């Protein structure tokens, strides 16, 4: 497997925040995400050794630094300013047997808080899969999912979308457009899936919103 989404460095203090590195396996093997211990350099050991005494970055009261094992979404409400290191581990399973894993050591820099871009709750998705919004598409029929994002502090929101549907021979497309509200933008996911894309497990898509200072990732199926 490999990661589809580039790392995020900056995030706001005392603000609920999400990031998804989105590991992907082209062979279709099962993936499980977890938080690991960052490694330090070690002579003669190319992978390094776990940092002794490492603890997860500090979180606001009643919250934890956590990762969803199914989607890979990292959730954190940082409680203090500073630089923090963490590790995402993605294990690969085939027929219930672990056959490999990848790690990504990353750094977060927590800065004073300003408003972050938010994805408005989609009113055209009524289903969910393990608590994540689930949109249904039918093979042979055009599929369009319109979403809206808002940021009260800026009039320019940039958006990107990542996921397996964009890597297929018959790829999904992603468009961003204006609305009547200068602080609000429209996002459209469009696809014409064929019978070849039909499968039991849903496709995971990550939408990233950026306001020039911070970004927020949102996962949906």
Predicted segments with their positions:
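Extracellular interdomain linkers/hinges and stalk-like, low-complexity segments
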Residues: 1-28, 97-153, 215-221
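Short helix-loop boundary/capping segments
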Residues: 9, 28-66
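Extracellular Ig-like/FN3 beta-sandwich strand-entry sites
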Residues: 16, 81-85, 142, 184-186, ...
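Solvent-exposed loop segments of extracellular immunoglobulin-like
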Residues: 17, 25-39, 153-164
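Residue-level signature of extracellular beta-strand-rich folds
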Residues: 21, 88, 147-149, 159-161, ...
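Surface-exposed binding patches on compact interaction domains or structured appendages
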Residues: 39-43, 48-52, 155-179
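Strand-loop-strand motifs at the edges of beta-sheets in extracellular beta-sandwich domains
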Residues: 54-78, 170-194, 206
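A short beta-strand micro-motif common to beta-rich folds, especially ectodomain repeats
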Residues: 83-94, 199-212
């Amino acid at each position: 497997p490999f990661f589809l989404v580039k790392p995020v460095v900056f995030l706001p203090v005392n603000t609920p925040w999400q990031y998804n590195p989105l590991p992907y396996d082209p062979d279709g093997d099962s993936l499980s995400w977890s938080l690991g211990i960052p490694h330090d350099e070690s002579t003669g050991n190319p992978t390094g050794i776990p940092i002794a005494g490492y603890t997860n970055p500090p979180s606001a009261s009643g919250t934890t630094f956590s990762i969803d094992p199914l989607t890979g979404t990292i959730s954190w409400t940082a409680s203090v300013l500073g630089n923090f290191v963490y590790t995402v581990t993605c294990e690969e399973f085939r027929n219930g047997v672990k056959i490999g894993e990848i790690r990504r050591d990353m750094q977060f820099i927590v800065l004073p808080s300003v408003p972050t871009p938010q994805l408005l709750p989609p009113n055209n998705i009524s289903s969910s899969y393990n608590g994540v919004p689930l949109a249904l598409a039918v093979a042979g029929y055009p599929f369009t999912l319109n979403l809206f994002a808002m940021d009260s502090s800026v009039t320019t929101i940039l958006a990107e979308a990542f996921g397996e549907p964009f890597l297929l021979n018959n790829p999904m497309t992603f468009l961003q457009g204006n609305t009547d509200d200068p602080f609000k933008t429209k996002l459209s996911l469009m696809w014409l899936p064929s019978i070849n894309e039909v499968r039991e497990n849903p496709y995971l898509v990550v939408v990233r919103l950026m306001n020039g200072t911070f970004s927020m990732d949102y996962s949906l199926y």
